[in-house]
Every structure is written in structure tokens, then in C-alpha cells.
Amino acid sequence: MERYGRPGEEGSRSDPSLEWTSHGGETAVEAPMWRLGLSGGGGGGGGGESYPERPDEPDCIYYLRTGVCGYGSRCRFNHPRDRGAVIGGVRGEAGALPERMGHPVCQHFMRTGTCKFGASCKYHHPRQGGGGGSVAPVSLSYLGYPLRPGEKECSYYLRTGQCKFGLTCRFNHPVPLAVQGPPQQPQQQQPQPQPQLQTIYPTLQSQSIPSSQQYGLVLTRPSFLTGSYLQSPYGPPMVLPPGMVPYSGWNPYQASLSAMPSPGTQPSIGSSSIYGLTPLSPSATAYTGTYQSVPSSNSTSKEFPQRPDQPECQYFMRTGDCKFGSSCRYHHPVDAVPPKTGIVLSSIGLPLRPGVAQCTHFAQHGICKFGPACKFDHSMSSSLSYSPSASSLTDMPVAPYPIGSSSLSGSSAPVSSSNEPTKEAVTPAVSSMVSGLSRPEPAETSGDSASVSGSIEAKTSS
């Protein structure tokens, strides 16, 4: 602090603070540091601590900027004595980047022509970029980001459409494909006469649809099947999808529409329902198939790896299949699982294996977690069997039951499979009914009626 007592001696020295303050751009901290003389070298360095000079190392940026170094003698960078000369060479002119001969070249400066560290950068910034010519200016897109065709694309820019580094980013920022530049005015095209397309729905009025020639474009109408346009009684016309087009002989179990029906076979819309769907006739072919067979080609389409030195794949040994396929690291023996010649599946998609033990889980819960790969039987019990052909209870034969008798005769009459009872079944029933009608009333019944009539006569006489 004794430096304040010797202003004359300080004035004789070359104070680099004059050069520092002659150029703009200092912060509010650097100028007072220079006035206080908190520097370590000959450029106004008081204080007893000396900083190491390492000419082969880069300059200590913090020391050049503030005049002090927190690491002291342990700092591994260079601390020149004449700090003012170094800063004067760096800031020879306003806005110039430092030229440090013998130091590595600033790669960011060589690519972009700019340096975000400015005068504090510790690398060399040659005046002539690269091969002796001036650094070519970076071309910018209309979005304001640099275009560098030879560099890697900026992943953040491709993901978000923005880049926080802006002009200093060293990656390429291509223009998105959807936005190739400012929108240009479309050229006016003279409308050309187009051949009229034959419509398959003549009741649709084309005046309500704007013409495609107003926009200079040629639009085509989507193709519909014949009869897909219907007039709805509740509002505007309705267009049905191709899957709902009515035609004769429609069956819900047919695969697909293989050909377009002819207009002659088209049923009239008025005789159909509101949506033009033809109801199924009673004579339509019913789906009576309960089981389906799995072709054996599916089992041979996969080949599993043979690894004798590895443990066996337990899933393959249990089900005969492996979801990992050729990438499974376990052994898949060929002779472990017998070849599948054909599997018969039930209506719920479980295998039927006559002669094999029944699946206990399916017998208890009605489901099987292994599905078609289960090796046990999944046959439905006789009490739970269902026949799709028995569609109504009215079709089932009903045996006649006599009204007057509590039970039939001792020997039960045979029941016919047809709806009409046979002669042998009707004869004992009729005879029992006749005998019941001709039977006299019991005595108790006649006595009760006599007592009731006597009580009525006594009340009237009194």
C-alpha cells in the first residue's frame, strides 16, 4: 500500500493503464485494478508475490485481465512481466483478435472467422486465414443460422428448429425441406378444357362443389362403388364407404369384394332399409364351422439355432416355439418337439388333442395362457357344448303332456325327433284324458256342496 506515497516514482514508470484506458470496452473492475497497481510484473506490479514465467505455456488469461492470479506460483500458465506490452499487442486496434505466434491456431476462428472469446482467447488468430487468403464470410440462411455444407449438422437445430449458439455455432444448419424459402407468388395458369369425368352417382349436383379450375389445379374425385350414394331422409345426401355397399347375396362371412356388381343386380333403395343395406334372408348360408385347421407350413417356416454346448431353451421345450428366433442363445434340439402335422383349434382358438390329458387350467378357469401352443387337450365338455344350428327353441321337439293327469303311464312313450308326435305317443295320453273326464267326483266334494246349499236356505228363511 506504500505505492500511494510515491506518486513521482510511479509517474516515471511506463504505466500501461494509459494504453488500457485509451481503448474502449473495459469493465468497471479492470480499470480500478490498474489504478491500484495490483499487478505482478513490471507493468505496475507492487506486492511481494511474484508469478511464474513460462514462455512455452499459454498466457494466464485471468492474470492479463486483472493483474492477479489466485494460483500464485502454482499456476501452470505464463505470467509475463510486461503485461502492458502483451495487452498492447493484443489490442493494437479496436476489435482485433490476438496474434500469438507459436501458439496453436484457433480452430473456431479458422472455420467461422469469428471468436467468441475475443481478445482473451489464448490461441493464435492469423490475419490470413488458412491458405493465405482472407477468411471467407459465412453464408447465412434466411432463418439467420450459418450454412456450413462440409460440417456436421446441428442436432439441436434439427430437433427444435432453433440454435442457442446462433452465428457462432460450428455445425451446419440446413433449411428444412418443408420450408425452402419465403413463399413465392404462384404463376397464373390459364384454365385448359378438361374432359368431363363420367360420374357414377348422377343424383349428386356438381354446382355445390367449387370448380377445380378456379385454383389452377386438376382434382380427381375418389372412386366409389356403384350405389354408394344414398339420399338420406333426415338431411343432406349421405355417401357410404365401399364396405357398406348393398348388393344381392350379401354374406357377412365373405372375404372381400372381388368384383364390382353390375347395376342390373342392384336392389332398389326404396325396398331396402334407410341405409340401403339388404337384410339377410333366412335361406342365407349359415356359418356352421366350429373348428379351423392350422397349416403345417407355419411350423417349418422358422429355424431355431442349434447350440449343443448351451442349456436347452425351456420355452421351446414346452411350447415348440421361441419368440427370440435365431437370436436365442439357448439350444433348440430338433428331436425334442415332434413335427406338427396339423392342429385343430376350437371355436375359442385353443387346440383340440384327442387322447391327450386335459388342460387343468382350462378345465377350472375356461382360459389357457399358452394358447394354441399348449400341449394338452382343450375339448369342451358335453354339458357346455353348443350347436350353432339350433337357433331357436321353437325348432326343438316337445312331447305332449296330458292336462288332467299328474304323470304319464308307467312306460314312457318314445319321443320322435320330428316336430309332430307319433301315434304311439298320442294314444296313451288320449286314453288317460278320457278316463279322467268320466271319473265320478269324490264323496267329500258332494258332501261339501250339500252343506253349503243347506246353509244358504236357512239364511233366506230367517
UniProtKB/Swiss-Prot annotation:
GO-annotated molecular function: DNA binding; mRNA binding; zinc ion binding
Protein name: Zinc finger CCCH domain-containing protein 34
PROSITE patterns membership: ZF_C3H1
Record keywords, A-Z: DNA-binding, Metal-binding, Nucleus, Repeat, Zinc, Zinc-finger
Composition-biased stretches (Low complexity): 405-418
Location relative to the cell: Nucleus
Source taxon at top rank: Eukaryota
Positions of the UniProt region annotated as Disordered: 1-26, 288-310, 405-462
InterPro entries the record matches: Plant_ZF_CCCH, Znf_CCCH, Znf_CCCH_sf
Presence of the UniProt keyword Transmembrane in the record: no
One Gene Ontology cellular component annotation held by this UniProt entry: nucleus
Basic and acidic residues composition bias: residue spans: 1-13
